[in-house]
Design a protein with these regions (language model features):
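Generic recognition of short, well-ordered alpha-helical segments
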Residues: 31, 100, 130-131
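Hydrophobic-ligand binding "helix-grip"
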Residues: 37-38, 45, 50-52, 65-112, ...
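A short acidic/glycine-rich loop-to-helix N-cap element
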Residues: 120-142
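Hydrophobic ligand-binding cavity/cleft-lining segments
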Residues: 2-55, 142
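Short Pro/Gly-enriched beta-strand edge/turn motifs at strand-loop
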Residues: 29-30, 56-60, 83-89
């Protein structure tokens, strides 16, 4: 894989959820990446390594524990499509060899927002593609449900 390219994953797993919260509140929750451990049980900690001129995280080191995906992962965040989309890509990890994903945010009405989460991972150990996809989907479903619970409480 060439430096700076996205992971060579066949296709990303994805999930979608409708949240009873204004789009501005959803954006705040998703854009404050360093606060993910407050609502996502699979993200144990986030260390901010770099930010842009607006103070948004551009590189962060995450301690994740999502079933078979337990690792310390450094991710780069891309803000070019914000505020409608936040993307991240793999930088470094102990076990994972690739990770990419995004949160897409769409206003349904004044008090309702739809969030689509796409995720793909590559792992250094041999794991059947079906198991990897199942783990990705479980991670997506859990993250979306926890985001919804966090915003609707």
């Amino acid at each position: 894989m060439e430096e700076g390219t996205l992971c060579a994953m066949s296709e990303l797993s994805s999930g979608k959820i409708t949240i009873d919260a204004p789009i501005s509140e959803v954006q705040v929750a998703l854009f404050e990446v360093a606060k993910y451990p407050e609502w996502s049980s699979s993200i144990k900690s986030v260390e901010v390594l770099a930010t842009d001129e607006q103070g948004r995280l551009t590189t962060g080191k995450f301690v994740i524990d999502a079933g078979m995906m337990k690792d310390k992962v450094t991710l780069d965040y891309e803000w070019a499509d914000a505020p409608s989309k936040l993307s991240f890509s793999f930088n470094d990890a102990d076990l994972l060899t690739g990770m990419e994903g995004s949160y897409s945010i769409k206003k349904i009405d004044e008090d309702t927002t739809e969030v689509t989460y796409e995720l793909g991972v590559e792992i250094s150990m041999p794991i059947p593609a079906m198991m990897r996809k199942k783990a990705e989907q479980a991670t997506i479903d859990q993250a979306l449900q926890q985001l919804k619970s966090h915003l609707e409480e």
